[in-house]
């Protein structure tokens, strides 16, 4: 772990309105599309707090972060019509808690398996990274799906409160 954090740098760009991959701010983190869209809809959910492990978050924040990640995952699945979602919390390269969310489709790799079996030069090719019209279309799709998921969540919470007599 070094004093320099690439995720913190990305968050700073979001706060300065300079991150073209930014989709939405939630209470515990930031939703961004991945630099590479080889797996269309590849999304990250970045913790607002710089911790290197999930268990280092305060208990209430940890639960909220996990719940919001689940909502982002649901929106990502809806927006990109995923057959299956792959979700990972790694941090070996960037030691700042963040989720990788990959919408997967039948036949999207030569053999069924993790996205990391795809050669890095293919997965992170320049032609994939710099396609801004495509990126903007994907951001709009994910933003609309987040609106839908968050609206349902707010309605569900309201129903729960009514049922509890609050």
Roles of regions detected by a PLM:
Residues 1-166:
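HIT superfamily nucleotide-processing domains
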